[in-house]
Structure formats: C-alpha cells, structure tokens
UniProtKB/Swiss-Prot annotation:
The lineage of its organism: Eukaryota, Viridiplantae, Streptophyta, Embryophyta, Tracheophyta. It comes from Huperzia lucidula. One of its GO terms (cellular component) is DNA-directed RNA polymerase complex. The keyword Nucleotidyltransferase applies. GO terms for biological process: DNA-templated transcription. GO terms for molecular function: DNA binding; DNA-directed RNA polymerase activity; ribonucleoside binding. This is DNA-directed RNA polymerase subunit beta. It is an enzyme of class 2 (transferase). It catalyses: RNA(n) + a ribonucleoside 5'-triphosphate = RNA(n+1) + diphosphate. Its EC number is 2.7.7.6. CDD domains: RNA_pol_B_RPB2. In plastids the minimal PEP RNA polymerase catalytic core is composed of four subunits: alpha, beta, beta', and beta''. When a (nuclear-encoded) sigma factor is associated with the core the holoenzyme is formed, which can initiate transcription. NCBIfam families: PRK00405.1. It is found in: Plastid, Chloroplast. The gene is rpoB. Its main location: plastid.
Length: 1080
C-alpha cells in the first residue's frame, strides 16, 4: 500500500526558544501601554475648574543611552527607556489649555536574550499558569449513597474574586464569594437590578426558578431591590445602615462599586463564558452581567436533569498562561492609579492655596519608578537568571509556575493538580519538573509549543489532508481543544513495508478526547511533526532517554542545569541534534549577523567587513561573573581574512564548542566494584583528571564593601591600617584598593577601610582608659573595617570597580572586587551523567593502580554497576558503548530518541554495529566480542592480572556539578549557640556546628567511638557549664568530669511539658544523685 506523506511540503524548524519572552514583551510595548494610558481617567479638582488628561495614543519611548551589553556588567545600571506621554491641563473658567509632553517614568527593557537587567543583574520573569477566567461546573456526591447532591458553578474573574453558585438537593440555589458563608441567589439577582418578572422571562426553566424565588422570598422577606443590596452587604460584609442605600443614585453607585472591581472577567473570561453558556454578549463587555448569572443557573438546572457536561479543571483548555505582558501591564496599571491619586491630591492642594497648577508640578516619575522597582525586586516570579551554563539559561526562560500570587501553594496543592494530564502532551514536558515539594507545580514548555494571544498553549501539528481544520491564520497551530475533535497520530512518520498488501488497512496509534487508541490511518486528520515534540529543551539533549525510567530522566534533565563550565570545553560524542539550537538561543554563542570577511580579530573583539563596504564590530565577553559565580567568557572561532556567511559562528562561549553546549567531558568509564570505594553511588577517578585539568572549572566570586558618611564622619579608604601586619596589606595601592592581577590568600585585605569611632566609645575601651590615665594619650579615633578574603576565597583579582550611584544623595561609594578561582576536581565533589546517574568522588587513585584496557589505556572513572538495574536508566549503557565506538572512530553521533519506532532493538543494533566497525577499522577486535558483546576484559593495574569477568566499558559524557566541596566544607571548634536549646546553630553561613543526626550516630557507632558519641550528644552540645570546663580539661590533658546538672535540652523538654500541664516531680535515680526540682 502506497501512502503519500509529501503532499504538505512545509519544512518545520525548531522555534526560537526565547520567543515566548520576546513576543510577550513586544505585546506589552505595542498594546499594553496604550491600553492602560487610554483608560487613564480625566482628573478634576473639587471645584471642577481644572482638568488633567493624558493622551496614550501619542506616547513614545526614548532609546537608552547605555548599551545592552554594558548595562549587564555595571553594578548599578538598569536597562530601561524613558516614557513620554502628551498631557493637557484645561482651565475651564478662563478657557486656557496647556499641552506638554511629560516624562512619567522609566520602563525596564527586555534584552535580546529575553531577560531584564536590573541594577546590573540579569533577571527573568517566570510565566505563571493559572485557572483561566470563566465558569466551571463540578458535582459533589454523598459519601454514603454515592448520588450527586450538589451542583457547583464557579465563576473565576480575571484579577478579582470568585463567585460560586450551588444547587443543592432541595432545589435551592445559593451563592458565595471567596469561600464566605452562602447567601440566597435571589439576593444577588435583585441586587444586580433584576426583578421577579424579568428573571422568569429570561430563564429557560421558569417553573423551577419560580419555586426557588418563592422559597427565598419567604425566608429572606425581600420586597424591593434597594433592600436587596443592603441585605447583601449585611450578610457578606457585616451590618450596613439601610438609610445609606435608600436613594436610587446611591444604590447604583454601590452596585458599581461592588460588582465591577470584584468580577472583572476580562476578554478571556468573557470568551469562555460565552462559549460555555452559549451567549452572544459582546467581547468588550468584560464585567459580570445579570444575564451571565441567569445563564449559569440555567446550566446548573440542565446538569440536574442530565443535560450538559462537567468541566475538567486540570485540562489545559481551562488554564491560561500569565506572561510577562500581563505582569507588566498590571504593574503599569497600578503605577498609573498611583499617579492619578498623586495628581488629584496635588491639584486640590494647589487650588486650595489659590495657586495655578502646571503640568510639571502635577506629574512626577516616582509612582512608575517605585512600582517597577518593587515588582522586579520582590515579586515571587521575578527571579535571578540561572546562568550556570547556556542550557540553564534557555530552560529558565521557558519555565511555568503554578505558584505565586493568585496560584497554588506548594503545601496544600493536591496530587491531582501535580499529576500529568493527557492534554499537556505536545505543550508541557511530562518529565522535567522540580524535585521535592514543588514537583508538578513548576514545569517547562515543550520545544514546539507556543502561546497564543489569549494566553492558551498551542502545539504544532501537521495536517494530513487539505481540509480547513482551524480558523486561525496559522494553519499548523492547534489549540488545546484540537484533540476533542480530531484524531492526532502520535507517530511523526508512518513506516510501511513494501511487501504489504495494497488493500490491507494500516493502523496507527492516535490521540482523541484524552484517550490513546489504535485507529485506521485513513481517519487521521493531524499528526505530530517530531518524536521530540512532547519534551522540553532540558530533556531532548539526553540520548536514548526512551530507555530510562522517567524519574531518572527527570534527574538527568535537572542535573544538566547544574553543570559548571570547564577549563577546556568538549562537546559530547553522542547527542540528539538539538544542542546547536539551545546554544545559539542562550546568547553565549556569537553569530554573524551578515556575511563578510574577518577584518580584525583578537580576544576582545571581532570586526567583520560586510559586502556593502561597512563594518560590524562585535565585542566579546571576557571573564565576566555570572549570577551563579561561574565564568562567562567568549573565544573567537574565526581567523583573520576568513570569509563567513550569515549565521556562522564567530565566537564560542565558556561552555560551548563549535556552537554546541559543552558542559561536560567524554570520560572513559568502567562499571565495576573496586574495593568498596564506589559503594552507594560513590565514584573513583584517575588522578590524570586533575593533572590534565579535565574537570577543572573557573569560578568568579564577587566581594562588596560600602564606604559612606557616618554620624561621626566619613569612612576612609586607605592603605594605612593600624594594628595590622604589613603582610596582609601587601596587595593594596595608596587608595586602599587591591591591585588587579594580585594573588590573594585567606585573611588578606583587599579593601582597606577605617570607620570613625565615637569619642565616648573610645573611652569605654579598657586600654583607652589606661592610656588616657597614665600617658594622656587618646586611643585611635577610628576602627578597622577592612574587607578581607574569607576562608576558601583565595584566588586572583581580575577586576576592581568603584561605583558612585547617580541618584544617591547619601554620597555612598560601592567597591566591588572580583576574584577568579581555578578549582580542580577533588574528593567530595559531585559528578553526574545525563541519565540521572550521580555520585560523589570518594577516592582519587594513581593512574598506575587504575584498571586498564587491552591496549594499555587506563580507565578514567569507575562507576558502580549496582546503580543501573535498580534505577532502570539503561540509556547510559547505550550512550557509553556508542561513545566508545565514536572515540575510536573519531566520530560524533546525533541519534534522535525513540528510534525503536523504525524496528525492534534498533538502539542495540546501532551500538553493536558501530562497535564491530570500530573493532575492525582500528585493529582492536576486543571492542566487540560475540561471546560478551559490549563488554571487555580489563587488567588490574595493581597486579597485572586479568579480572575474572568481562566488564562494561565505554565513553560517557560526565558533568561536574555546581555542588562542590569547596563551597560546603566547614569546621569550627566553638561558635554561636541557639538561645532556646543552647545547641550549635545550623549551617556554614552562621558558623554552625556539626549536627549529629541519625546517620552520624550510625557512623560513629560503626567505628565503636562510644565515648566520643556520648560527649557529642551531651556535654559538648548543650550543657552550658560542662562545655566550658571540657575545653580546659582537654588542653590540660585531664579526664573529663561528669556533669552534676542536667543539659539544657532536658530542661527545655521539662518546660514544654509544663506548658501542657504536665509537671516532672522529684525522682531518685541513684542514692547519691537526686534531680533538683529548681534546676528544671
């Protein structure tokens, strides 16, 4: 049977991964600003003599004076543009009109990478997934009988509150607002301006509604609509004086004040309600109408008699994405409201003082500046851009969160809200999500998914026939309800055997109405365009992940985001082909904007001579610190005089090679136990990984100090620091700043600073009184507040910046010192593969002790074989074997996952054929042995003997993660204690002590250290008197005395029991020891 799949010859390419951020910001700039300026009201004074007005259609933005690249690394600059709006002030009595274009504030600009630069720091706004505004129906069943007792309709507003309509078993309809107590629906209808006659004429079931009204009137005793408003306020918000709503005008004002702000549906909510209830209300009517409530009551009655459908609240058609445009437009609206209040107060104040207001005296930029500063600095969904490596940056910009204001909370979110729904396929990745309490609440966008102008997720599908399936202009974009009407083939292509009978019907797997079924190919209307269409950017680079358990694929995708850039980047031998797009869209790779000839190239810039005779000068990033303290650096990939085409690579980033992500290394690994040192995910490595800088990474730490004017005088930056040894000041210049290029150690001063001391404070110091009394000498009037290198912070100073904020009236000076560190891999560092196989370096072996191959090559890393079968991540075996073949053949493989759709065991056949080819072409027949395919005999480096069993070896792409022992190792002899329990504080940042928990107790018990364990749990921990004595006893070499009192934790327990009215009385433990009641 011949099937023509070429009738639609559209070429599908990967979309720009920054698209969702950039398009949303463009929508805010082009539409959102104008919409809010058009809604800005006319402002009048109390005498209605002056009128102020803004004209939104003529606004304009000024291009920022600082370039995008410069603002990112200047620590106080925000990348923004100035907003100017025409304004008019009318003086009605005199007929004077003044018009002026006013500056109302700065709008933060999004960079070309989809990020915002706020105070020199790259930030990103996470998209939020919320329940879409509209109406949703659900039912509640009796737990005993199983029958439906209540039908609930929930009307969700855009930014306001929720209204619930409940039809109970007694045919009574109630409503409630935001989980407050329920009130009769008749109150709501009468308060909205309806009467009984109009209600009965509008509904489709007047008999049922008549009974509801009659019972409600008997109970509520409501006769007229003004009384209904008063009763409504009284029952929902407390008591209300009825005289306040006696007049019709006040009634109308209260009705407007009550309904419009609380039930603003927005255009999306209006669209959903019209679609669900089959209404013809104009889309510009964005507030809840009485007609909507009556139609909702009708639909509830229909559900009672078996007509209509309930809604699945977890379906993506009932959810929308609140993007950057929505957040910024909402904040801009809030800023304009604050500006309107400010203008109103100022115009009234000036008219009361008999002064003539001017436009300049009324308008200020403070409301807009403060509102956006508050949003970017404190809003939960405005986050630091994760810049650990290029792949991390792309993933962070494509993330969704169900948390945040208006969303779910991670503590009470149900399993159903976190679970995978059939509607997410092709739109949200079912694998990549956070681990822990945020699992299922934070997810990533699939690679071909997009967001429409309503905020709904779409997926790209291929039409099989020339039928009109979608009304949208883009004929290949299917919205979230497409699977409700069409059969969608889940295979990207259809493989047909040439021996098949032409008349035989061919079946394929398809998706229809949230179900997966087998159907005839002739009934297929749509099909997916790629087998990777279901997954996100973080999952797609994992080779052979179809052979992994989903939990391990999740861990692998998360750990790829934690990989640090290495000293010498190396791209993976085995990949999936998606790597180049991720690297280019991350912004770490420099791409040629036009074709031309390389006219000049060095480590800092590249000049391209284009065809028209002009030049394009591109500055490169050199040793810049990222938000995660990793190094951002770009290296030229072109030579002088080379001719380039548009789109070719000019420079690679710190973690890219050849335009592909290169955050790891192709390491020769062996899966075997080795003396127990790789037990429980521990990893053994060869010392050559240290000497050859294979896993050496570069980190840049930023240290900050502020010099300001205090009450006792200005702080001084100087090299002359009293009472400090000259050795610690050896790197300072005459201004007290460290010299760039200096190698500094722990304790060295990098910024010398003296702070004035209060004269009275100087005399309080004992030596001050002594010097004053004997010699008449005043102690130094300053104290040393230098910035010193902290423990573990040694390195080379690469930059020193002194910054004076322009808008600061406190004359502050900020000094930033950047120190570069080269960190070699060491015991305690965390490494991982791309399949969730992670471990900690437990031992570094000499290269002569490592097992070696039959050609003499020593193994570079030994992994535990027990970590594969129980975790079910077999993809790592396919990767390392294919990587071994590629290493010998000098080839790189790009294998799209799910290759089993072509034939059974396709992955295994590919690996074995490449291993066999490598063995034949390199004269190493041991690479593929028929008796043990994929395994080889290894030789013990210590004895020279062959191991008894063949061992799986290969080249795996291993990553060095940002969880490094240099950042975690910590020790203290004594330090701060908790005031309540008197136990050491927790954490390195607080100078905390070792927390002896359950596993630590087991470790000490395993070594038989019973006395050490007893001391750590008692007297060294929370016994105040005993821990002071034990220091002297240890120094003097004397035995440790047994304490005579109880530890503080036992006293705390006794006090807590007393709070529960349980008193511990005297108890004789021994004849010579009685617990004293007073001590408790």
């Amino acid at each position: 049977m011949k099937i023509d799949l070429e009738q639609n010859e559209d070429i599908y390419v990967l979309p720009d991964f920054r698209k969702i951020q950039l398009e949303a910001f463009h929508r805010f700039i082009n539409q959102g600003i104008m919409e809010e300026l058009d809604n800005f009201p006319k402002i009048e004074d109390t005498d209605q003599e002056f009128e102020f007005q803004l004209f939104g259609e003529k606004y304009y933005l000024l291009e920022p004076s600082v370039k995008e690249g410069d603002s990112l690394y200047e620590s106080i600059i925000t990348n923004s543009c100035k907003l100017y709006v025409p304004a008019r002030l009318t003086q009605r009595k005199k007929g004077k009109v003044k018009e002026q274009t006013v500056f109302i504030g700065n709008i933060p600009l999004m960079s070309s990478q989809g990020t915002f630069v706020i105070n020199g720091i790259a930030r990103v706004i996470i998209n939020q997934m919320l329940r879409s505004p509209g109406i949703y129906y659900k039912s509640e069943k009796d737990p005993d009988s199983g029958e439906i007792t209540t039908y609930t309709a929930t009307i969700i507003s855009n930014w306001g509150e929720r209204l619930q309509l409940e039809l109970d078993a007694n045919n009574r309809i109630w409503f409630r607002i935001d989980k407050k107590h329920k009130v009769s629906i008749l109150l709501l209808l009468l308060a909205m301006g309806l009467n009984e006659e109009k209600i009965l004429d509008t509904v489709h079931y007047p008999e049922v509604m008549s009974d509801i009204i009659r019972e409600a009137k008997d109970e509520e005793n409501i006769e007229w609509k003004e009384n209904a408003v008063s009763e409504l306020y009284e029952q929902i918000f407390g008591t209300t004086d009825e005289e306040d709503v006696e007049s019709y005008d006040i009634f109308e004002e209260l009705k407007k004040e009550f309904f419009e702000p609380k039930f603003e549906l927005g255009r999306i909510g209006r669209f959903n309600i019209n679609k669900k209830l089959n209404l013809n209300v104009p889309k510009d009517e964005i507030f809840l109408l009485p007609k909507d409530v009556l139609a909702a009551i009708d639909y509830s009655i229909k559900l009672r008699i078996g007509v209509g459908t309930f809604d699945d609240v977890d379906h993506l058609k009932n959810k929308r994405i609140r993007s950057v445009a929505d957040f910024l437009q909402n904040r801009f609206k809030l800023a304009l409201e604050r500006l309107g209040d400010l203008v109103h107060r100022r115009i009234n104040r000036l008219t009361r003082r008999k002064r003539v207001p001017t436009i300049g005296s009324l308008v200020t930029s403070d409301p807009l500046l403060k509102t956006f500063k508050e949003f970017f600095g404190s809003y939960p969904l405005s986050q630091f851009l994760d810049q650990t490596n290029p792949l991390t940056q792309v993933i962070h910009k494509r993330r969704f969160s169900s948390l945040g204001p208006g969303g779910l909370t991670k503590r009470i979110a149900s399993i159903k809200a976190r679970d995978i729904h059939p509607s997410i396929y092709g739109r949200i990745c079912p694998i990549e999500t956070s681990e822990g309490m945020n699992a299922g609440l934070i997810s990533s966008m699939a690679i071909y998914a997009s967001i429409d102008h309503w905020g709904f997720l779409q997926s790209t599908l291929h039409k099989e026939y020339d039928e009109v399936l979608f009304e949208e202009q883009n004929q290949d974009m299917a919205d979230v309800s497409a699977e409700e009407y069409f059969r969608i083939a889940t295979e990207a292509c259809l493989a047909v055997s040439p021996e098949e009978d032409e008349n035989k019907e061919i079946f394929t797997v398809a998706q229809l109405q949230q179900e997966f079924l087998t159907t005839s190919w002739d009934r297929i209307k749509l099909r997916i365009i790629s087998p990777l269409q279901y997954f996100s950017v973080g999952v797609c680079p994992i080779p052979s992940f179809e052979h992994n358990d989903a939990n391990r694929a999740l861990m692998g995708s998360n750990m790829q985001r934690q990989a640090v850039p290495l000293f010498e980047p190396e791209r993976c031998i085995v990949g999936t082909g998606l790597e180049g797009q991720a690297a280019s869209d991350s912004g770490s790779v420099v791409i040629a904007e036009q074709g031309g000839k390389v006219d000049y190239v060095d480590g800092k810039e590249i000049t391209l001579l284009v065809n028209g005779g002009g030049t394009i000068n591109t500055k490169l990033i050199t040793y810049q610190r990222s938000n995660n303290n990793t190094c951002m650096h770009q290296k030229p990939r072109v030579n002088l005089g080379e001719y380039l085409k548009e789109g070719q690579i000019l420079a690679d980033g710190a973690a890219t090679e050849g335009g592909e992500p290169a955050s790891g290394k192709n390491i020769l690994v062996a899966y075997m136990p080795w003396e127990g040192y790789n037990f429980e995910d521990a990893v053994l490595i060869n010392e050559c990984l240290i000497y050859e800088n294979v896993f050496t990474s570069i980190h840049i730490e930023k240290y900050e100090v502020e010099a300001r004017i205090t009450l006792n005088g200005p702080e001084i930056l100087t090299r002359e620091i009293p009472h400090l040894d000259d050795y610690f000041l050896r790197h300072l210049d005459e201004n007290g700043l460290v010299l760039p290029g200096s190698w500094v150690e722990t304790g060295d001063v990098i910024v010398g600073k003296l702070t004035p001391r209060d004269p009275e404070e100087s005399l309080k110091i004992p030596e001050g009184n002594l010097l004053q009394a004997i010699f008449g000498i005043d102690i130094t009037a300053t104290r040393e507040t230098c910035l010193k290198v902290p423990p573990g912070g040694k390195g080379q100073v690469i930059d020193v910046r002194s910054v004076y904020p322009e808008d600061d009236n406190q004359y502050r000076n900020f000094i930033y010192v950047y120190i570069l560190q080269k960190r070699e891999i060491k015991v305690g560092d965390k490494v991982a593969g791309r399949h969730g196989n992670k471990g900690i370096i437990s031992k570094i072996l000499p290269r002569e002790d490592m097992p070696y191959l039959q050609d003499g090559t020593p193994i570079e890393m030994i992994l535990s074989p027990l970590g594969v079968p129980s975790r079910m991540n077999v993809g790592q075996i396919f990767e390392c074997l294919l990587g071994l073949a590629g290493g010998f053949l000098k080839r790189h493989y790009r294998v799209i996952p799910f290759d089993e759709r072509y034939e059974r065991e396709a992955s295994r056949k590919l690996v074995f054929s490449e291993l066999n080819k490598a063995g034949e072409q390199t004269t190493n027949p041991w690479l593929f042995e028929l008796d043990n395919p994929g395994k080889s005999l290894l030789i013990d480096g210590r004895t020279g003997e062959i191991f008894q069993q063949p061992i799986t070896i290969g080249k795996a792409y291993m990553l060095k993660l940002i969880h490094q022992v240099d950042d975690k190792i910590h020790a203290r002899s004594s330090g701060p204690y908790s005031l309540v329990t008197q136990q050491p504080l927790k954490g390195r940042s607080r100078m905390g002590g070792q927390r002896v928990g359950e596993m630590e107790v087991w470790a000490l018990e395993g070594f038989g250290a019973s006395y050490i364990l007893q001391e750590m749990l008692t007297i060294k921990s929370d016994h105040i008197q005993a821990r002071q004595k034990i220091i002297n006893n240890i120094v003097a070499g004397e035995p440790v005395d047994k304490p005579e009192t109880t530890p503080e934790s036992f006293r705390l327990l006794a006090r807590e029991l007393r709070c529960l009215a349980l008193n511990l009385d005297h108890a004789v433990v021994k004849k010579d020891l009685i617990i004293d009641y007073k001590e408790l």
